[in-house]
Every structure is written in structure tokens, then in C-alpha cells.
Amino acid sequence: MKVDYIFMVMKGRVIRLYPKDREKEFFNLCFRFNNRAWNICHANQIAYRQAQQNNLMPNYPNHGKSITNNKDNLDKKADSKIKNYVVKAYNQGWKKYYTEKNVNKPKFHSFRKSRKSYTTDKPIFEGNKLTLPKCQPIKFKGQLLNNEIANITIFMKNEKYYASIIYKNEITQKPFEIFFCYYYILFLC
């Protein structure tokens, strides 16, 4: 009886975006909200740890409510998925800090120095145009795959906008290949 194993592998592509002024304003708003959400998560974590040291027995910090309770309503103007991805990335940063060696603590993000990016999902591709939530269609240049999209990260580098698309890709391997790869890796280590 032959058994094949199926692995889910993530692959990525980067495409260049050509947004108009309105979309550029929207992207900058999303970058600002992403930065603010990260910094609020970090401030909540610091306050939680200080309260723990003073034996005040705090509850676990609720990042969600404090991120959305702001005066300028950035959360309503920006993409709604940003908050979820920021909290997830922040928690992963702390997990890496405690589990891996040579990883620094998560810190506050400066808007000028940090990489201006945000992550979302459910993009729609129609021809050579990309449609994101709460955004008009944007022209892009690059090749796409026909696989399922896991998420998309919009980032700005040198005043140019790019999208990093992460695809889900299935790979089928036979047991002998897995056995051989496992022992080859052990041999190299």
C-alpha cells in the first residue's frame, strides 16, 4: 500500500503597485494605524508587567478595546483586519523572545524609522488590477500564481508601493523521500 504525504508550504511573490493619490492616502493611514496598534499593544504589556511587579493582580491586557478607543477613529477609516494581524504579530514576537536565542524584545515602533507596512487578506485580482478592502482597484505589475492566497502585505520602500502575496501551496511526497530528507538533515547537523 503506497501512502503519499501532503505538506502545506507557503510561497510568496512581490508585485509592484501603482496607486493613485487617494489610494496612497489610504495606505499611509493604514501604516499609521498599524504602527499605533503595535505601540498600544506594547504599552499595555508594559503596564501589565509593572502592575504584576507591584502585586496589583491585573487582568490580562485587552489589546482590542484599547486599540479601537481612539479619538480620530483611525480604526474605522483603515482596514479592519489590521488590528487582528498586529495583535497576532505582537504575541508571536513575545513567543519568539522567550523560545529562541538571539531574539530581541518587542519594542515601540517609530513611524519614521520602521518599515511602513500592513497585512490584510481577501484581495481580489481582476486582470491587472488589485482590489483590497475599503480601497479602489489599483494597477500592479508582476506575475500571479493560481493558488489560494493566505494573506497580502502592502509595504512602501523608497516612496514606491509593493505587495507581498503569500500563497498556500500543497506538495506531495512519498515516504521514502521524507525518510531520506530526514536523515540527510541529521547528517548535515
Regions found by a protein language model. Give the residues of each.
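Nucleic-acid substrate recognition interfaces
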Residues: 1-189
